[in-house]
Amino acid sequence: MVLLPAFLDGLARTVSTKKGKKLSEDEDGGREIAKSMIKDSKKNSTLLGTSGFVSSESSKRFTSICSNRGEKGINQDRAIVWEGFGCQEDITFCGMFDGHGPWGHVIAKRVKKSFPSSLLCQWQQTLASLSSSPECSSPFDLWKQACLKTFSIIDLDLKISPSIDSYCSGCTALTAVLQGDHLVIANAGDSRAVIATTSDDGNGLVPVQLSVDFKPNIPEEAERIKQSDGRLFCLDDEPGVYRVGMPNGGSLGLAVSRAFGDYCLKDFGLVSEPEVTYRKITDKDQFLILATDGMWDVMTNNEAVEIVRGVKERRKSAKRLVERAVTLWRRKRRSIAMDDISVLCLFFRPS
């Protein structure tokens, strides 16, 4: 166990509000407080939910976002970055949500809207439970517990919502919380997080993948699906793309093994539980890339890092990745309808 009095004292500043209310006193009240924080952040230009960029004078971080609609109809990708998350100057929250199915765009939009406030509530409740003890868990344990609870709550919220049909629709989720030099990644789906770090010889950058692309044919995922009587199969026109389906579901299936929604498959191995990982950011680490599978389907980790490295204006970094991915898609997969492509680039320090 690690003693963290200073760390917890810093987080505790988010407990009190102008009205003197505490997040831990009432979960509904906590959500209202979080929503109020979101409104204030939008006014102060520290929260971005569309293509563009946001910078933080206090943390010296810079984030760029870009999204491109594919050839399948409505853009079902949603992204968000929130500098000063929870009124903490040194915390940045990033989220990438990729919808699928008839209601995928609606679900991704709802998750993007509700996830930050829910995470704030769970973060505060976890903090309150830990701060009552003289010995507290590490920063990673704190965020991991909050993330696991949030993913569960978001999935249940979709299930009981009378206004959204998430039986055969859903969305993946990839989130990042950066507090000081603590980076926590939570992933349920096939979007990917890649960090660019200085090579050992100091002459370049190398990519380090921080998340797993949760496809149904990954051994651990496939075993869970089989144990749940789910079916693994590929469509005739996509022989290398494995899907999870119902035992007698015909061609109905999903090409990821973890996601929000899709309740027709939740009894057959699909789960919404994320994998939560940690990295201590050092001076060698330069930037983080979060992107939906539309980009990674046609671009390697190394290619992505090199493209961002070569961009002179950081605000154009995400856009440059999207443009390159579109070009590669048309060259490599011209017989397949282009997927939505969304990218977020987070730079850790000033240029």
UniProtKB/Swiss-Prot annotation:
UniProt cross-references to Gene3D superfamilies, sorted A to Z: PPM-type phosphatase domain
EC number in record: 3.1.3.16
SUPFAM superfamilies documented for this protein: PP2C-like (SSF81606)
One record GO biological process: microtubule cytoskeleton organization
Molecular function per GO: metal ion binding; protein serine/threonine phosphatase activity
Cofactor: Mg(2+); Mn(2+)
UniProt: Mn(2+) 1 binding residues: D98, G99
GO cellular component: cytoplasm; nucleus
EC top class named in words: hydrolase
Reactions that this protein is recorded to catalyse: O-phospho-L-seryl-[protein] + H2O = L-seryl-[protein] + phosphate; O-phospho-L-threonyl-[protein] + H2O = L-threonyl-[protein] + phosphate
Cofactor binding description: Binds 2 magnesium or manganese ions per subunit.
Residues covered by the PPM-type phosphatase domain: 62-348
Residues noted as binding Mn(2+) 2 in the record, renumbered to the chain: D98, D293, D339
Coiled coil feature spans: none
Protein name as it appears in the record: Probable protein phosphatase 2C 41
Organism: Arabidopsis thaliana (Mouse-ear cress)
Taxonomic placement: Eukaryota, Viridiplantae, Streptophyta, Embryophyta, Tracheophyta
